[in-house]
A protein has these predicted regions:
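Extended, Lys/Arg-rich, non-catalytic nucleic-acid recognition/anchoring regions
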Residues: 1
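Terminal beta-strand-rich extracellular "head" domains
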Residues: 98-115
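Exposed extracellular interaction/assembly regions and N-terminal maturation sites
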Residues: 31-99, 103, 126-138
């Protein structure tokens, strides 16, 4: 059995409840200066000292003679990294600037060398004036 109501109208729609809080949205920080494009600094001499502009870039070294790459003091901060590559025949040896410590698995841990032409490595600053060298080193 069904019942039908004649003359019944629908009442007004009730008010909508309050919208729940979504929480404050934090401020957006400034855009960083990092780029996804790797810069290349080509060096052709027999000595080079890293500079802050080498940060997050690739320093290539190409010379027929031996090359000394110096890690200077008080330039880089913890978590900074620089990539290096030996393009020429001259073997690249890393040297500690005054007060700098280099750690590596190289035969001379504090003065590692790139193993051969086309070898590469990363230099990572792990603390003030302290660097870890990882890669194709001798």
């Amino acid at each position: 059995m069904s019942i039908s109501l004649i003359g019944v109208t629908t009442g007004p729609t009730g008010p909508t409840g309050a919208t729940g809080a979504t929480g404050a949205t934090g401020a957006t920080g400034a855009t960083g200066s990092s780029s996804s494009v790797l810069g290349i600094n080509t060096q052709t001499g027999t000595t080079y000292t890293l500079v802050i502009g080498d940060l997050n870039d690739l320093v290539t070294m190409s010379n027929a003679g031996a090359i000394t790459l110096t890690l200077p003091p008080s330039v880089f901060s913890a978590n900074d990294a620089i990539n290096i590559a030996q393009i020429g025949a001259g073997q690249v040896t890393l040297a500690q600037g005054a007060g700098v410590t280099i750690n590596s698995t190289g035969a001379t841990a504090t003065a590692p060398k790139l193993r051969a032409q086309y070898s590469s490595a990363s230099i990572i600053c792990t603390a003030s004036n302290t660097f870890l060298v990882v890669g194709d080193i001798a």
